[in-house]
Amino acid sequence: MAKIQKTVKSTTSSTAKKAGQPPGTLIYTGKKTTEKVIVTIYNYTSDTFEEQEITQLNDLSKFKNNTSNTWINISGLHETALIEKIGTCFNLDAMLLEDVLNTNHRPKVDFFEDHLFFTLKMIGIHTNQKDIDYEQVS
């Protein structure tokens, strides 16, 4: 019979990073990494679709006041200064950005006047491993 192994993860490190900080303080609670952060914009309407990797933050401003739908995909949240600049560009609340950087956040949905915010877990299985992997989607 196959043996099931359970991995126990410590959650004290991520909460300890935020302890004593005022609400809205931008602290990344995920795994430390040095990988490059990649920002990709998906801009779409019922008739069009545009995908663009952003290399300069100034390129984000053209998506701010458009009438189409815009999805900002950020692969890598460890550069909090970059996340803060993106939040400033789109007038996102610091509490919302804090939720994005908290990779242990429970699923939720917040409705704002001009945008929708949700956070949830995306689950995947690596075919070459027997582990279940998950990442946060916000």
Regions found by a protein language model. Name each.
Residues 1-138:
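Peripheral, non-transmembrane regulatory/ligand-interaction domains of membrane transport proteins
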